[in-house]
């Protein structure tokens, strides 16, 4: 029969075996159709994930078998966030305290770290990484020197068996991505290559499971290579490569190993589409085995999707493997034909299931879903984003001109995160205020030195990403002309004309400083606070405990003359430009004020705040009359009088930075505030009237940028002045090294 599949070079006709004719839902006798259709694949993944979750094995949820299941579950969960995958993982991690079993040097007990590290980065949850990091720090700092010869004392404290190359190395790479500490990569590199040199058979291009099988042949007299043992290796390589920096010196070693192993495994595929347990003796036993098959399929398909493997050459094998796998799924979602826990080929039946088999199915199916989405959108645009820094960058916004070669029609527009296989929230914005949409905004996390692709899909039938306008700003006329803005992490307000009036019409407060609202992460508070009115006490969502007064609060401008700061009054006009799931933007105008010597200054300020960020970006333009230039100061409150500061830090390296840590009220926790300027200040910081300023010369109409941010220790993993300073330094480094974006 003829089967048509999409290759990287277009549609190609394959002449496959008659057994492959059952590639449609109408002829499948299993519970999982083998159709290469996005919804069908997604339904299959949910079916298998839910069945396995409802049928747990009687062993620790931290066992390596569950580690392999979680590896598939996290890929499925990240690709279908509305599905059951991520909730199941969060529940498992929280119930187990994100820990590992007690064999700290044993690779098997590291396997749960795949999912724990992904959840740490996905959720911004450092607790998910702490315990696995402590374990691997111990392994790295006090490495074992045991022999790799299997069954010798301490051999399993090293990666002396092929399974270990899946269980442990990817966790080291993920820790390097999360922490920016390249020592994890160096350790992994050294140990991996030693194991590869020891277990890899260069003649056959396959891995022995361990050294016992160097001399133990298969029943037919050929070398014994176990399919799942090789499946572990080829499935582990994508987990390593996807988080390894693009410029890592030995990256080509892993790329070449993927190609060599895939080529050798392709030759071993049986006519039923699977890889039998014994690769060179498929009659030992003559049965399809699904865990090895699906791990191998995943590694091959990832290689195709990334361009390492030729699609025309490997797609027929992948098609046959997926058909065999779907035929092994019952109508209830149980994946059968999975060899039980073993270290060599053995016997099993269609009734044998295992959690690692389901994990392999979720990995392979999630990767296949990406391929199908690629195939179904031939007109897509690709946005390639490079992180030039050697550090993890959470919640970074990517800005792309719109329309970028497309129709400019927002209907059916989707932004697809290729790494995670999911549609992500996006926002179309008019960033220059001319009434025309000009920019596409979206966000992701970026790991050190990595290159990521995102697809812009127009007229797509994929479902929209769940999103809410978490980035929000508005004028608040009902509260004396406040103007407030917030995202999922932080909230602020500035003061308008009405509050400056004397009582009883106003409060007599003249201030162009910025207030900080302490809020619980994820909870919108602006409308609730103003509706309640009583926001100076914490009713569960946060409170206003910060004292601004006439100072700069957590960020503001002063113009200096003769060494003295001159500040504006309250804002004269303020308007929201746009709100959305990624960014809010607004414009504020401060009316002209006298700075002496016949000089008057006005400020127009544009402020943006992105989701997942604690810092607002400010672009100020001064309108100067009576002088060619003035000395502007970007400042923040640092004096004891208003907020009882416990620590204040100022640094001028690579751009100015100030941080402060205060306890405005005894029982309501601490606030961190900070100002960052992406330019080198003139001289040292200047203290004046309870505030500290970073100075620069500014000409009339010359824009300059600065950032202000805040954190509340009761709603953040940042719990100290040192932690807040480290976060501000991280943000400053990211500001100085923006993401590199290319559209093609």
Predicted regions and their residues:
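Solvent-exposed N-terminal domain segments of exported/luminal and surface proteins
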Residues: 455, 460-565
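Extended, loop-rich substrate-binding clefts of extracytoplasmic carbohydrate-active enzymes
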Residues: 527-611
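Extended ligand-binding clefts on enzyme/binding-domain cores
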Residues: 162-163, 173-279, 286-297, 309-338, ...
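Extended ligand-binding groove/face enriched in aromatic
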Residues: 86-90, 98-214, 219-223, 331-332
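Beta-strand-rich recognition/accessory modules
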Residues: 433-446, 673-744
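Alpha-mannosidase-like glycoside hydrolase catalytic domains involved in N-glycan trimming
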Residues: 378-473, 509
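Acidic (Asp/Glu-rich), glycine- and aromatic
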Residues: 603-605, 609, 614-649
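CBM-like carbohydrate-recognition segments
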Residues: 35-67, 74-95, 99-122, 126-138, ...
């Amino acid at each position: 029969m003829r089967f048509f599949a999409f290759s990287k070079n277009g549609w190609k006709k394959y002449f496959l075996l008659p057994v492959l004719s059952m590639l449609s839902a109408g002829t499948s006798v299993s519970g999982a159709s083998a159709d290469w259709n996005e919804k069908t694949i997604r339904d299959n993944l949910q079916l298998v994930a839910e069945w396995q979750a409802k049928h747990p094995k009687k062993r620790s949820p931290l066992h390596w078998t569950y580690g392999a299941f979680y590896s598939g579950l996290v890929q499925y969960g990240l690709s279908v966030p509305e599905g059951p995958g991520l909730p199941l993982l969060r529940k498992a991690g929280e119930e187990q305290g994100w820990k590992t079993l007690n064999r700290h040097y044993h690779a098997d007990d590291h396997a749960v770290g795949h999912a724990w590290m992904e959840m740490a980065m996905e959720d911004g949850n450092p607790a998910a990484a702490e315990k696995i990091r402590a374990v691997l720090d111990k392994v790295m700092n006090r490495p074992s020197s045991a022999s790799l010869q299997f069954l010798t004392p301490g051999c399993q404290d090293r990666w002396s068996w092929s399974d270990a190359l899946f269980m442990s190395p990817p966790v080291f790479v993920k820790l390097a991505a999360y922490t920016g500490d390249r020592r994890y990569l160096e350790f992994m590199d050294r140990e991996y290559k030693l194991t590869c040199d020891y277990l890899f058979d260069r003649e056959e291009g396959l891995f022995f499971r361990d050294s016992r099988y160097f001399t133990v042949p298969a029943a037919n007299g050929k070398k014994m290579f176990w399919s799942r043992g090789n499946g572990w290796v080829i499935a582990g390589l994508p987990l390593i490569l996807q988080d390894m920096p693009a410029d890592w010196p030995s990256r080509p070693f892993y790329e070449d190993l993927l190609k060599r192993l895939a080529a050798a495994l392709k030759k071993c595929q049986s006519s039923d589409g699977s890889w039998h347990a014994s690769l060179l003796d498929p009659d030992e036993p003559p049965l399809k085995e699904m865990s090895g098959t699906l791990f191998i399929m995943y590694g091959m398909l990832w290689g195709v999707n990334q361009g390492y493997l030729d699609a025309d050459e490997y797609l027929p094998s992948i098609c046959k493997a997926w058909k065999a796998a779907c035929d092994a799924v019952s109508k209830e979602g149980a994946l059968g034909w999975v060899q039980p826990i073993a270290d060599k080929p053995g016997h099993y039946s269609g009734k044998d299931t295992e959690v690692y088999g389901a994990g392999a199915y979720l990995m392979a199916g999630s990767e296949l879903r990406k391929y199908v989405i690629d195939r179904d959108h031939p007109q897509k645009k690709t946005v390639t984003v490079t992180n030039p820094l050697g550090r993890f960058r959470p919640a970074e916004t990517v800005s792309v001109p719109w329309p970028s070669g497309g129709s400019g029609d927002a209907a059916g527009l989707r932004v697809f995160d290729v790494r995670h296989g999911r549609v992500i929230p996006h926002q179309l914005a008019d960033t220059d205020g001319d009434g025309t949409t000009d920019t596409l905004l979206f966000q992701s996390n970026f790991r050190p030195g990595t290159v990521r692709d995102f697809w812009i899909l127009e007229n797509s039938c994929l479902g929209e990403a769940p999103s809410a306008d978490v980035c929000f700003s508005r004028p608040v006329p009902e509260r004396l002309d406040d103007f407030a803005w917030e995202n999922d992490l932080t909230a602020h307000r500035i003061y308008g004309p009405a509050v400056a009036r004397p009582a009883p019409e106003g409060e007599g407060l003249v201030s162009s400083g910025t207030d900080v609202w302490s809020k619980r992460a994820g909870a919108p508070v602006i409308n609730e606070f103003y509706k309640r009115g009583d926001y100076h006490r914490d009713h569960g969502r946060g409170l206003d405990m910060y004292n601004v007064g006439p100072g700069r609060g957590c960020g503001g401008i002063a113009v200096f003359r003769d060494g003295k700061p001159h500040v504006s009054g309250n804002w004269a006009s303020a308007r929201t430009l746009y709100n959305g799931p990624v960014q809010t933007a607004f414009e504020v105008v401060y009316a002209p004020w006298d700075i002496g010597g016949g000089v008057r200054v006005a400020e127009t300020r544009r402020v943006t705040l992105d989701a997942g960020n604690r810092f607002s970006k400010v672009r100020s333009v001064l309108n100067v009359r009576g002088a060619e230039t003035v000395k502007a100061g970007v400042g923040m409150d640092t004096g004891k009088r208003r907020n009882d500061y416990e620590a204040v830090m100022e640094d001028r390296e690579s751009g100015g930075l100030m941080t402060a840590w205060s306890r405005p009220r005894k029982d309501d926790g601490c606030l961190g505030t900070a100002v960052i300027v992406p330019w080198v200040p003139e001289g040292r910081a200047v203290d004046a009237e309870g505030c500290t300023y970073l100075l620069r010369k500014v000409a009339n109409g010359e824009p300059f940028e600065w950032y202000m941010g805040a954190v509340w220790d009761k709603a953040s993993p940042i719990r100290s002045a040192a932690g807040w300073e480290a976060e501000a330094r991280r943000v400053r480094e990211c500001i100085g090294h923006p993401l590199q974006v290319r559209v093609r």
